[in-house]
Structure formats: structure tokens, C-alpha cells
């Protein structure tokens, strides 16, 4: 009597672990926050008299706003390039992470996603440190100013990217067999 080998074989598939799923959610949140930060009109505000974004600088003169492009200043272009570069890398990492869910062998995608996210974090931290240093150095406002929600969104995106990178760095061999 012949026995069927198909009933005895152990089929082993790579299961999506909760940490990698949370990592993917972190990457998605970072991407959303980056989009909000780049499009935000409020990076620096000053008593309803002045506001600065990554794209334009506006001053209130009498009862109307006068706006100029910020893409004429080297440090503002550098900040924008660093943030957009980081956002592009986060987008690629998100797509690779999303694709890795659909393919059978996910482990080979963990390291590239983590490396991309760490690279994005480095770019964004450089841009977010450069921005206030050069702003304070070059812009002289006689009134109280504060860094606003657009700048905060960019920091939030950086923190979520870092969290996603840490989650994708965790060694899957140590815990994947339990899921």
C-alpha cells in the first residue's frame, strides 16, 4: 500500500509578523506626515505678521500679504532637497515593504527596507537641523516667532521612520517561528 507523501509534508511559509506589520504602518505614517510637512504653509510664524514655509515667505504689509519664493536661498533649497529626498526614500521603502507582504520570501526585504529608512532619517535630520540654524542666522524678525506645525510634522515623520527602521532591523529568526 502506497502512502501519500503530500499529507506528511510540512509546508513552511513565511508569516507576516506583527512587528513587521507595525513597521509598515510606521512607514505609512511617516510618508503621510512628510507629505503634510512639505505642503504645510506654516513652518515659522510670527504674530500674524509673517510666515515661512518651504515654498514661500510672506509678510503682512498694511492689510495685505506680500509673498516671495523661498527657492532663491541656498539653505532653503538644501532643506527642501533633503526633506524631499528623505520622503522619496521613505516612499520606496514603503513600496518595497508592501511588495514584501505579497511575496513568499519576506526576510530578504527586511534589511533593504531598514537601510533605506535609516538613510531617510539621516537626510531628514540634516534638513531639520539645518533649517532652524540658518533661519535664525539669516532672517531677522523684530517680533516673536515660533516654529510651527509644519516643522513638527517633519519631525514626526522622522521619528516614525526611525521607529520603522528599528522594527525592520529586529532579527526575524529569533521570533518568526513563534507566529
From Swiss-Prot:
Keywords assigned by UniProt, alphabetized: Cell junction, Membrane, Transmembrane, Transmembrane helix
Residues annotated as transmembrane: 21-41, 81-101, 113-133, 150-170
Localization of this protein: Membrane; Cell junction, Adherens junction
Keyword Transmembrane appears in the UniProt entry: yes
Coiled-coil residues: none
GO biological process per UniProt: cell-cell adhesion
Domain of life, per lineage: Eukaryota
Entry membrane topology: Multi-pass membrane protein
GO annotation, cellular component aspect: adherens junction; cell-cell junction; membrane
InterPro entries: P53_induced (IPR015664)
UniProt keyword Glycosyltransferase present: no
Family per record: Belongs to the TMEM47 family.
Role this protein plays: Regulates cell junction organization in epithelial cells. May play a role in the transition from adherens junction to tight junction assembly.
PANTHER family: P53-INDUCED PROTEIN RELATED, TRANSMEMBRANE PROTEIN 47
Name the record gives this protein: Transmembrane protein 47
The organism's taxonomic lineage, starting at the top: Eukaryota, Metazoa, Chordata, Craniata, Vertebrata
Amino acid at each position: 500500500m502506497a502512502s501519500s507523501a503530500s499529507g506528511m509534508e510540512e509546508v513552511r511559509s513565511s508569516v507576516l509578523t506583527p512587528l513587521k506589520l507595525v513597521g509598515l504602518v510606521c512607514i505609512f505614517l511617516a510618508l503621510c506626515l512628510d507629505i503634510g510637512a512639505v505642503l504645510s504653509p506654516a513652518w515659522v510664524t510670527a504674530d500674524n505678521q509673517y510666515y515661512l514655509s518651504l515654498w514661500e515667505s510672506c509678510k503682512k504689509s498694511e492689510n495685505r500679504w506680500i509673498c516671495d519664493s523661498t527657492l532663491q536661498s541656498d539653505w532653503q533649497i538644501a532643506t527642501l532637497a533633503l526633506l524631499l529626498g528623505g520622503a522619496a526614500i521613505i516612499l520606496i521603502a514603503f513600496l518595497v515593504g508592501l511588495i514584501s507582504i505579497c511575496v513568499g520570501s519576506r526576510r530578504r526585504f527586511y534589511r533593504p527596507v531598514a537601510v533605506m529608512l535609516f538613510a531617510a532619517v539621516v537626510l531628514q535630520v540634516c534638513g531639520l537641523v539645518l533649517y532652524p540654524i540658518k533661519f535664525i542666522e539669516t532672517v531677522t524678525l523684530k517680533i516673536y516667532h515660533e516654529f510651527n506645525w509644519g516643522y513638527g510634522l517633519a519631525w514626526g515623520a522622522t521619528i516614525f521612520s526611525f521607529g520603522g527602521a528599528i522594527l525592520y532591523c529586529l532579527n526575524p529568526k529569533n521570533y518568526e517561528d513563534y507566529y
